Every structure is written in structure tokens, then in C-alpha cells.
Amino acid sequence: ILQFWLTFLAKEKFKGITYEIIADPTGNKINRLRVHVDSKISKFTIQSLSYHLEKNNPAIFVRDDLIHLNHFELDTCNLKKGQERVVMNELKKIILQLNSRKIKNNISQKEYSIKSNKEWLSWLN
């Protein structure tokens, strides 16, 4: 899965987006894809990308623990066969929408935290 993602991203050559494979920080025997966004080059924030991926249909959930450092991680452990393509196709779709400003592309860390907390707590209602 990770090799497919690396190949896909290398072909797309998204400006301001870099990526790397990292070991799972919890010690599990899996690797993750860490996605970095340089908003000065990409013209959108990592928070915008993460937010719109999670609001997408289908939703693509990211590991956003360190999003304030301008990166998130994609985890492969819960994907079923073929879903790795869906993840990349939806990532591409969201990036193109962010680049064309069809969706909000300047979500700040503060705004992202507020939106995330509201969504997280919305199930209480």
C-alpha cells in the first residue's frame, strides 16, 4: 500500500507537498505515510487538507496529533483491498479543490482545533 501511495504521489508532483514513510511511533509493526505541507508553496494549509479529507465522502481520517508541525500521517492498518486507491484519488481531488479555491484553503491551527473539538463533541447532543 505504501509503495502504491509513494508512486502515486511521485507522479502527481503536488507543489509544496512532501511525504515520507515513518515507523509507527507506538511500536506496532506497521509504517505510516507522513504528509508535509508547505503552505507558502502549496497555497493551502495542512489543516485545510486534513479538515476537508475528514469531511469528504468517503471520509479519509488522518493521524493529526502533530498537525501543528505542518504534517499528518496516513495509516494503512484498517484499509481493505482497493481502498488505497480511494485514499489517493480523494487526496488528489481535495488538493485540486484547495488549489482552485473551490473549498476553504486557509484554515488555521486555531480554527482547526475549534472545528475538530466541536465535531468530536457533537455526538453528545
Question: Model-derived features: where do they sit?
Answer:
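Conserved C-terminal alpha-helix-loop-beta "cap" of PLP-dependent enzymes
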Residues: 8-107
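Structural signature of PLP-dependent enzymes
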Residues: 1-7
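Structural signal for terminal/edge beta-strands and the immediately following C-terminal loop/tail
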Residues: 97-125
